[in-house]
Amino acid sequence: MDVNNVELVISAVRPEQYPETDLPEYALAGRSNVGKSSFINTMIRRKSMARISQKPGKTQTLNFYKIEEALFFVDVPGYGFAKVSKTEREKWGVMIETYITSREQLRGVIQIVDLRHKPTEDDRMMYEFLKYYDIPVIVVATKADKIPRSKWQKNAKIVRETLDFDPDDKFVLFSSETKMGKDEAWQFIKEGME
Protein backbone atom coordinates (compact mmCIF):
# COMPACT_ATOMS: atom_id res chain seq x y z
CA MET A 1 0.00 0.00 0.00
CA ASP A 2 1.27 3.45 -0.88
CA VAL A 3 0.93 5.48 2.31
CA ASN A 4 0.86 9.28 2.29
CA ASN A 5 -1.71 10.17 4.95
CA VAL A 6 -1.41 8.93 8.53
CA GLU A 7 -2.95 10.41 11.63
CA LEU A 8 -2.85 9.41 15.30
CA VAL A 9 -6.58 9.76 15.97
CA ILE A 10 -6.78 8.87 19.65
CA SER A 11 -4.98 7.18 22.49
CA ALA A 12 -7.72 5.21 24.22
CA VAL A 13 -7.99 3.24 27.44
CA ARG A 14 -11.73 2.40 27.37
CA PRO A 15 -14.13 1.16 24.65
CA GLU A 16 -16.15 4.39 24.72
CA GLN A 17 -13.01 6.21 23.57
CA TYR A 18 -12.48 4.01 20.50
CA PRO A 19 -13.05 5.77 17.15
CA GLU A 20 -16.62 5.50 15.88
CA THR A 21 -15.92 4.18 12.42
CA ASP A 22 -16.39 1.07 10.32
CA LEU A 23 -12.80 1.06 9.03
CA PRO A 24 -10.96 -2.24 9.49
CA GLU A 25 -8.43 -2.36 12.32
CA TYR A 26 -5.22 -4.31 12.81
CA ALA A 27 -3.77 -4.54 16.31
CA LEU A 28 -0.02 -4.77 16.88
CA ALA A 29 0.88 -6.94 19.83
CA GLY A 30 4.28 -7.83 21.20
CA ARG A 31 6.65 -7.68 24.10
CA SER A 32 7.92 -4.32 25.25
CA ASN A 33 10.84 -3.12 23.12
CA VAL A 34 10.32 -5.79 20.46
CA GLY A 35 10.08 -3.26 17.63
CA LYS A 36 6.35 -2.47 17.31
CA SER A 37 6.96 1.25 16.77
CA SER A 38 9.71 0.58 14.20
CA PHE A 39 7.36 -1.86 12.43
CA ILE A 40 4.60 0.78 12.26
CA ASN A 41 6.99 3.47 11.04
CA THR A 42 8.36 1.14 8.34
CA MET A 43 4.90 0.10 7.18
CA ILE A 44 3.70 3.70 6.88
CA ARG A 45 7.02 5.10 5.61
CA ARG A 46 7.51 7.54 8.48
CA LYS A 47 10.51 8.03 10.72
CA SER A 48 8.75 8.87 13.95
CA MET A 49 4.97 8.67 13.70
CA ALA A 50 4.99 5.95 16.34
CA ARG A 51 7.45 7.08 18.97
CA ILE A 52 10.39 4.77 19.37
CA SER A 53 11.74 4.54 22.88
CA GLN A 54 14.80 2.91 24.36
CA LYS A 55 12.75 2.52 27.54
CA PRO A 56 10.36 -0.44 27.41
CA GLY A 57 6.75 0.13 28.46
CA LYS A 58 6.38 3.50 26.73
CA THR A 59 3.03 2.69 25.08
CA GLN A 60 0.41 2.65 27.83
CA THR A 61 -2.73 3.22 25.77
CA LEU A 62 -4.36 1.83 22.64
CA ASN A 63 -3.03 4.18 19.96
CA PHE A 64 -5.28 4.33 16.88
CA TYR A 65 -3.39 5.36 13.72
CA LYS A 66 -5.66 6.08 10.74
CA ILE A 67 -3.97 5.18 7.46
CA GLU A 68 -5.14 6.65 4.14
CA GLU A 69 -8.75 6.88 5.40
CA ALA A 70 -8.77 3.11 4.72
CA LEU A 71 -7.80 1.34 7.95
CA PHE A 72 -6.35 1.68 11.44
CA PHE A 73 -3.22 0.30 13.03
CA VAL A 74 -3.84 -0.07 16.76
CA ASP A 75 -0.65 -0.10 18.80
CA VAL A 76 -1.32 -1.84 22.11
CA PRO A 77 0.90 -1.71 25.22
CA GLY A 78 3.81 -4.12 25.16
CA TYR A 79 3.37 -7.12 27.39
CA GLY A 80 5.90 -8.72 29.71
CA PHE A 81 7.46 -5.50 30.97
CA ALA A 82 8.60 -5.97 34.57
CA LYS A 83 9.25 -2.35 35.56
CA VAL A 84 5.63 -1.32 35.83
CA SER A 85 3.57 -2.39 38.82
CA LYS A 86 1.64 -5.64 38.75
CA THR A 87 -1.58 -3.60 39.06
CA GLU A 88 -0.63 -1.53 36.01
CA ARG A 89 0.21 -4.67 34.00
CA GLU A 90 -3.14 -6.19 34.96
CA LYS A 91 -4.93 -3.01 33.82
CA TRP A 92 -3.12 -3.18 30.48
CA GLY A 93 -4.06 -6.86 30.18
CA VAL A 94 -7.76 -6.13 30.72
CA MET A 95 -7.61 -3.19 28.29
CA ILE A 96 -5.97 -5.33 25.57
CA GLU A 97 -8.25 -8.33 26.14
CA THR A 98 -11.37 -6.14 26.05
CA TYR A 99 -10.28 -4.58 22.78
CA ILE A 100 -9.26 -7.83 21.06
CA THR A 101 -12.29 -9.86 22.12
CA SER A 102 -15.01 -7.25 21.62
CA ARG A 103 -14.00 -4.90 18.80
CA GLU A 104 -16.04 -5.72 15.69
CA GLN A 105 -13.74 -3.69 13.43
CA LEU A 106 -10.70 -5.81 14.38
CA ARG A 107 -9.71 -7.84 11.30
CA GLY A 108 -6.47 -9.31 12.59
CA VAL A 109 -3.52 -9.08 14.94
CA ILE A 110 0.07 -8.58 13.91
CA GLN A 111 2.04 -10.33 16.64
CA ILE A 112 5.59 -9.07 16.72
CA VAL A 113 8.43 -11.21 18.07
CA ASP A 114 12.19 -10.71 18.03
CA LEU A 115 13.85 -13.18 15.64
CA ARG A 116 17.05 -13.07 17.70
CA HIS A 117 15.45 -14.55 20.82
CA LYS A 118 13.30 -17.52 21.70
CA PRO A 119 9.73 -16.31 22.33
CA THR A 120 8.82 -15.81 25.97
CA GLU A 121 5.96 -17.40 27.85
CA ASP A 122 4.08 -14.11 27.33
CA ASP A 123 4.57 -14.41 23.54
CA ARG A 124 3.30 -17.99 23.64
CA MET A 125 0.29 -17.03 25.75
CA MET A 126 -0.61 -14.15 23.42
CA TYR A 127 -0.49 -16.42 20.36
CA GLU A 128 -2.55 -19.07 22.18
CA PHE A 129 -5.07 -16.39 23.23
CA LEU A 130 -5.47 -15.21 19.62
CA LYS A 131 -5.94 -18.79 18.39
CA TYR A 132 -8.48 -19.50 21.14
CA TYR A 133 -10.59 -16.52 20.06
CA ASP A 134 -10.10 -17.40 16.38
CA ILE A 135 -8.51 -14.03 15.60
CA PRO A 136 -6.59 -13.95 12.29
CA VAL A 137 -2.91 -13.52 13.14
CA ILE A 138 0.37 -12.96 11.35
CA VAL A 139 3.59 -13.48 13.28
CA VAL A 140 6.22 -10.93 12.27
CA ALA A 141 9.75 -11.79 13.40
CA THR A 142 11.56 -8.45 13.55
CA LYS A 143 15.22 -7.48 13.69
CA ALA A 144 16.27 -10.02 11.04
CA ASP A 145 19.01 -7.60 9.99
CA LYS A 146 20.59 -7.93 13.45
CA ILE A 147 21.62 -11.56 12.94
CA PRO A 148 23.49 -13.29 10.10
CA ARG A 149 21.30 -14.49 7.26
CA SER A 150 22.65 -18.01 7.87
CA LYS A 151 20.77 -18.07 11.22
CA TRP A 152 17.40 -16.90 9.94
CA GLN A 153 15.86 -20.31 9.29
CA LYS A 154 17.20 -21.84 12.51
CA ASN A 155 15.87 -18.94 14.58
CA ALA A 156 12.55 -18.92 12.69
CA LYS A 157 12.17 -22.64 13.48
CA ILE A 158 12.74 -21.94 17.20
CA VAL A 159 10.10 -19.19 17.11
CA ARG A 160 7.57 -21.42 15.34
CA GLU A 161 8.16 -24.39 17.64
CA THR A 162 8.00 -22.30 20.82
CA LEU A 163 4.71 -20.68 19.77
CA ASP A 164 3.30 -24.03 18.58
CA PHE A 165 2.75 -22.13 15.35
CA ASP A 166 -0.21 -23.03 13.15
CA PRO A 167 1.11 -23.60 9.59
CA ASP A 168 -2.10 -22.02 8.25
CA ASP A 169 -1.04 -18.69 9.77
CA LYS A 170 1.39 -16.35 8.05
CA PHE A 171 4.96 -16.00 9.34
CA VAL A 172 7.16 -13.16 8.07
CA LEU A 173 10.81 -12.30 8.62
CA PHE A 174 11.02 -8.53 8.94
CA SER A 175 13.62 -5.78 9.04
CA SER A 176 12.85 -2.11 9.50
CA GLU A 177 16.38 -1.40 8.20
CA THR A 178 16.07 -3.21 4.86
CA LYS A 179 12.23 -3.19 4.62
CA MET A 180 12.28 -6.97 4.18
CA GLY A 181 8.84 -8.45 4.95
CA LYS A 182 6.97 -5.18 4.46
CA ASP A 183 5.14 -6.35 1.31
CA GLU A 184 4.16 -9.68 2.90
CA ALA A 185 2.75 -7.89 5.95
CA TRP A 186 0.72 -5.54 3.73
CA GLN A 187 -0.56 -8.57 1.80
CA PHE A 188 -1.97 -10.07 5.04
CA ILE A 189 -3.67 -6.75 5.79
CA LYS A 190 -5.13 -6.38 2.29
CA GLU A 191 -6.51 -9.93 2.34
CA GLY A 192 -8.32 -9.20 5.60
CA MET A 193 -9.87 -6.04 4.15
CA GLU A 194 -11.48 -7.84 1.20
Swiss-Prot record:
InterPro entries linked to this entry: G_ENGB_dom, GTP-bd, GTP-bd_ribosome_bio_YsxC, P-loop_NTPase
Molecular function terms, GO-annotated: GTP binding; metal ion binding
Domain of life: Bacteria
Keyword list, A-Z: Cell cycle, Cell division, GTP-binding, Magnesium, Metal-binding, Nucleotide-binding, Septation
Residues in EngB-type G domain copies: 22-194
Keyword Cell cycle part of the UniProt annotation: yes
Bridged cysteine pairs (disulfide): none
Binding site for GTP: 30-37, 57-61, 75-78, 142-145, 174-176
PROSITE patterns: G_ENGB (PS51706)
Chain positions recorded as Mg(2+) binding sites: 37, 59
Gene Ontology CC: cytosol
GO biological process, one term: division septum assembly
PANTHER family for this protein: ENGB-TYPE G DOMAIN-CONTAINING PROTEIN (PTHR11649:SF13), MSS1/TRME-RELATED GTP-BINDING PROTEIN (PTHR11649)
Functional note: Necessary for normal cell division and for the maintenance of normal septation.
Family of this protein: Belongs to the TRAFAC class TrmE-Era-EngA-EngB-Septin-like GTPase superfamily. EngB GTPase family.
Name the record gives this protein: Probable GTP-binding protein EngB
Originating species: Listeria innocua serovar 6a (strain ATCC BAA-680 / CLIP 11262)
Name of the gene encoding the protein in the UniProt record: engB
